[in-house]
Swiss-Prot record:
Catalyzes the covalent attachment of the prokaryotic ubiquitin-like protein modifier Pup to the proteasomal substrate proteins, thereby targeting them for proteasomal degradation. This tagging system is termed pupylation. The ligation reaction involves the side-chain carboxylate of the C-terminal glutamate of Pup and the side-chain amino group of a substrate lysine. Keywords: ATP-binding, Ligase, Magnesium, Metal-binding, Nucleotide-binding, Ubl conjugation pathway. GO terms for molecular function: ATP binding; ligase activity, forming carbon-nitrogen bonds; magnesium ion binding; ubiquitin-like protein transferase activity. Pathway: Protein degradation; proteasomal Pup-dependent pathway; Protein modification; protein pupylation. It catalyses: ATP + [prokaryotic ubiquitin-like protein]-L-glutamate + [protein]-L-lysine = ADP + phosphate + N(6)-([prokaryotic ubiquitin-like protein]-gamma-L-glutamyl)-[protein]-L-lysine. The reaction mechanism probably proceeds via the activation of Pup by phosphorylation of its C-terminal glutamate, which is then subject to nucleophilic attack by the substrate lysine, resulting in an isopeptide bond and the release of phosphate as a good leaving group. Mg(2+) binds at residues 9, 55, 63. NCBIfam families: pupylate_PafA. Its EC number is 6.3.1.19. This is Pup--protein ligase. It comes from the Bacteria.
Length: 454
């Protein structure tokens, strides 16, 4: 597919710290966080004027699902817009708590694990053609996704019986299956539940739940952009070497724990390859494919360049060439510098605090955004574009229809219901519009509905 629909769903960690008032459980804090949402949406599960979905997921995790995007920079802008929306809710919740005598601080983290060992995810969605065998796609994709943490991991201090170590991925130790229709119970690499949110005759939705949440815009580009390129190869029928793994769940952990990239992976055919060799194989194939077929979007040259530089940096052990662009390397540089200045080990509480605060979405408090304000990380999207995405949907996908409908209904105080494919005015019989084409941003039926609303 030359054009593809993308989406990212992010679950956020939430906590509350107060020196002089009673502690609040995450569930209580989440209720304060969503009180404003419930007041206008009558629910903690709403669609916004920018086409996105905002809701409370299982337990106490706020979740933001971007609108449908057909460009990677657009996707990153809408993912970042979700952070701004939630950060605004944090300010509202903080004020409400203070008015009720709670003088603590609410924190939202865009990470994947908490101190109790719980994991929450970053799920990627890719529209793929219905044609073709899904099992073949999964066989080719899983070895790539297991090793993708080298180029897209968020980094994490891991406590082990042998002491603290730094790992590529936050999510790797919490994945339990290769493919499954469950998301929370078994945490597979690929979720197979067939909910295309599009015309099921032509499309299917690939739901990847193995990835880390990314603070870095360039790492987010790598996470999604490399999958897009590998999918294009598979869809074009490119023959790949058989790299099916004997035990992908064991391998994903062993790879995460070895920053040299040389963790050996036993394949189903008995051969052994390192994580670096597997990634290099995909990079070589993708590069040849792009050379033969051309770049299908303007981001491809950067993706291929950063992919190659990251693998070379891991191989050499010198990450200076990527420590403004790849999350795990950015964070490691920050920690190494702090440890050196203060003579601290990796297991020091202050280093654990750095590990966490890197993911704080607060623009005034989070360490990643402190680095960004100093020009210490590479940008892809202007702040003005991100701010526009807080209110405005992507103009090139179905999200425009949904966002425009939600905005008009809210302005006029009309009772409505929406989901990914339906638009409905509840105060009119037979006023449900089914929007099955996610690429379609103009629809005469929706125009007529908006006009009829006044």
């Amino acid at each position: 597919m030359d054009k593809r629909i993308f989406g990212i769903e992010t679950e956020f960690g939430i906590s509350y710290s107060s020196p002089d008032s009673r502690p609040l459980a995450p569930e209580e804090v989440a209720r304060y966080l969503f009180r404003k949402v419930v007041s206008w949406g009558r629910s903690s599960n709403v669609f916004l004027t920018n086409g996105s979905r905002l809701y409370l997921d299982v337990g106490s995790h706020p979740e933001y699902a971007t609108a449908e995007c057909d460009d990677l920079a657009q996707l990153i802008a809408h993912d970042r817009a979700g952070e701004l929306i939630l950060d605004d809710l944090v300010d509202e919740a903080q004020a409400r708590l203070a008015a009720e005598g709670f003088n603590g601080t609410v924190y939202l983290f865009k990470n994947n694990t908490d101190s109790a060992g719980n994991s929450y995810g970053s799920h990627e969605n890719y529209l793929i053609p219905r044609r073709g065998e899904f099992s073949r796609l999964a066989e080719i994709l899983i070895p790539f996704l297991v090793t993708r943490q080298l180029i897209a991991g968020a980094g994490k201090i891991l406590k082990t019986p042998h002491g603290a170590t730094y790992a590529f991925s936050q999510r790797a130790d919490h994945i339990w299956e290769g493919v499954s229709s469950a998301t929370t119970r078994s945490r597979p690499i690929i979720n197979t539940r067939d909910e295309p949110h599009a015309d099921a005759e032509f499309y299917r939705r690939l739901h990847v739940i193995v990835g880390d949440s990314n603070m870095s815009e360039t790492t987010a580009l790598m996470k999604v952009g490399t999958v897009d390129l590998v999918l294009r190869m598979i869809e074009a029928g490119v023959i790949m070497r058989d790299m099916r793994m004997e035990n992908p769940i064991r391998s994903i952990r062993e790879i995460s724990h070895d920053l040299s990239g040389r963790a050996l992976v036993r394949l189903a055919n008995g051969r052994q390859l390192t994580a670096l060799e597997i990634q290099q194989e995909y990079l070589t194939k993708v590069t040849a494919f792009v050379r033969e077929n051309g770049a299908h979007n303007p981001h491809v040259p950067l993706i291929l360049d950063l992919w190659e530089r990251t693998l070379k940096a891991i191989e050499s052990g010198d990450t200076r060439s990527i420590d403004t662009e790849i999350d795990w390397a950015i964070k490691k540089k920050l920690m190494d510098s702090y440890r050196e200045r203060h003579g601290l080990g990796l297991d020091a509480p202050r280093i654990a605090q750095l590990d966490l605060t890197y993911h704080d979405i607060s623009r005034s408090r989070g360490l990643y955004y402190l680095l960004q304000s100093r020009g210490a990380v590479r940008r892809l999207v202007d702040d003005t574009v991100i701010k526009d995405a807080v209110d405005a949907p992507p103009q090139t996908t179905r999200a425009k229809l949904r966002g425009d409908f939600v905005r008009r209904a809210q302005e006029l105080g009309r009772d409505y219901t929406v989901d990914w494919v339906h638009l409905k005015l509840n105060d009119r019989a037979h006023q449900t519009i089914l929007c099955k084409d996610p690429f379609r941003s103009v629809d005469e039926r929706v125009d007529a509905l908006l006009d009829s609303m006044g």
